[in-house]
Amino acid sequence: MTLRLTLRALACASLLGTAVMNAPALAWEPTKPVEIVVPFSAGGASDQMARSIQGIIAKHKLMAQPIIVLNKAGASGAEGLMDTKASRGDAHKLLVTSSALYTVPMISQLPFNWRDLTPVAMVALDEFVLWTNAESPYKTPADFLAEAKKNPGKMKMGGTSSKREDQIITAQVERKAGAKFIYIPYKGGGEAATQLSGKHIDANVNNPSESIGQWRAGEHRALCVFAPARMDYSGKITATQSWGDIPTCKEQGLDVQYQMLRVFMLPGGVTPDQQKYYVELMQKVVATPEWKEYLEKNALKNEFLSGQKLVDFLGADENRHKDIIKEAGFVAAR
C-alpha cells in the first residue's frame, strides 16, 4: 500500500511539474512606482501632458503602481535626456519629450542619441501659434512683422529654452520675413506665457496648451498657427474663437510650418516584454474619452505611432531637423 501511494504521489508530482512548465509566463508589469521624466519645467506642454496621462491612468486603474512625474529641466532639457540614458535597463522610468530628443544633442554636441533609448509611442503632434499681447496693436502677422522690420533687433520674442523649437521657429520667421528679434529664453512655455501677459516681451510662439488660459482670459491674441492646415477643432475657447478659427501662418503670407512630436521613451536595455507593456498602456490611454478631450482642449493633432513606424518617423524627423538647425546656424562648434 505504501509503495502504491508513493508511486501515485510521484506521478501526480510529475504531472504538476509538467503543467507548471507548460503554463504561459505571466506578462511583465511594474513592481514599484513608475517615474515619468519631463525634461522641461512645470507648466509647459510636456509637463501638462505627463500629468494628464498620470490622471487618466489613475482614474481608469490602467496600472497597479502609481506614477510620479519628475521635472528635470536643466541645460535646456539635457538633464532629463541624460538621466534617462543613464538609467539603462530601468523599466520603471519613462521619458516624455518632444523634438528636443534630437535637437538638444545636435545643437549642444551632447553625447546622446535617441537610439540609446527604447521607443514606446508617439501620442500626438503639437502645434505652435504666434501669440501677442491682446492689448498690442498687432491684429495680423503682417502688422506684427511690419513693426519688427521697422525696429530690427528691438522687439522681444520669448520662448522655451535656447536653440530649441521656439527659437528654431523664430529663426525661420526672421529668415522668411526679413526681420530680427531679441530672443528671450525661459525654462518653459508657462513662464513665456506669463511674461507676455505682463508685456515683458512682444510675442511668443507657444504651443496652444501653454497659452490657452491667457487666451481664454483675453490676455493673448492668436495671430496664426505654424501648421500645414488649420487646427481641426471647432469648439469655442474664447467668446468668439475656436482653435480652428486661427488662420495658418501661410494663409497670412508667412510661409513657415513646424509641428512637434510628443513621444514616450524607455531607457535602453529593457526587455521586449517591458516595452510591449508600455505600448499597450499608451494604447489604452489614447482610447479613453479623457484623452480625446485633452487633445481637443489643447489643440493637439491626434497621431499615434509605435513599433517600426515610430522608429521610421523618428529617423525622418531627425533628418528634417538637421537641415532646419543647420539653416538656423545653431549647430555648436566642435
Model-based region annotation:
Residues 125, 211-287, 316-319:
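C-terminal lobe and pocket-closing loops
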